[in-house]
């Protein structure tokens, strides 16, 4: 039977363990592993009741150490941020607007349903549209945005126009005139697994 640690001690232990992991990996000149689904769940509990002096670190972990897309950790992150954006879960460190921005940084996957749904939200529609304008991994949700635009939703129409104009590309820094590279030549047959 495992003994549950008090919240202060548990949070310190979780953060200390992650910092130790970062230090260990840095000594090998490799980045820290992204957070797992269970680590993200623990992080969310800390975000709801942040230990003193850890707010910035917690926000950095949520924004930069959770893989985007459709892995289990991204699912947990998207669920939490969706609840914050919709006002279902209060979080003193993340406003609904900030939650929308963090959802947009996930680039597709579990964040899409919430962002598309927020196109109908009077307070957050503009923020959701801004994030969707730079999200390309929409899959079937493209049709949902299109349907909203056809129903007269101006935010959805703005997203569709942005995609048509390629703003996701034209808003980026220009492509450099020249790029220096190193070529790794392998004789015989190889695949990306060999390079991983």
Regions found by a protein language model. Give the residues of each.
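Amphipathic alpha-helical scaffolding segments comprising HEAT/armadillo-like alpha-solenoid repeats
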Residues: 37-45, 68-87, 106-120, 137-149
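Alpha-helix N-cap/helix-start positions at coil->helix boundaries
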Residues: 52, 89-94, 109, 121-126
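Fe-S-dependent hydro-lyases/dehydratases of central metabolism
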Residues: 130-196
């Amino acid at each position: 039977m495992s003994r549950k640690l008090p919240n202060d001690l548990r949070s310190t232990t979780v953060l200390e363990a992650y910092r130790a992991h970062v230090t260990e990996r840095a000594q090998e000149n490799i980045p820290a592993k992204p957070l797992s689904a269970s680590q993200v769940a623990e992080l969310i509990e800390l975000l709801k009741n942040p230990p003193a002096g850890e707010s910035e670190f917690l926000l950095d972990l949520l924004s930069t150490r959770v893989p985007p897309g459709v892995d289990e950790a991204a699912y947990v992150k998207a669920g939490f941020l969706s609840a914050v954006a919709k006002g279902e879960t209060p979080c003193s460190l993340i406003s609904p607007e900030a939650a929308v921005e963090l959802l947009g940084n996930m680039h597709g996957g579990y964040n899409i349903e919430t962002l598309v749904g927020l196109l109908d939200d009077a307070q957050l529609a503009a923020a959701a549209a801004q994030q969707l304008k730079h999200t390309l991994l929409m899959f079937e949700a493209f049709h949902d945005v299109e349907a909203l635009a056809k129903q007269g939703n101006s935010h959805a129409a703005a997203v569709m126009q942005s995609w048509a104009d390629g703003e996701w590309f034209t808003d980026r820094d220009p492509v450099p005139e020249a790029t220096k590279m190193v070529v790794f030549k392998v004789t015989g047959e190889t695949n990306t697994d060999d390079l991983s």
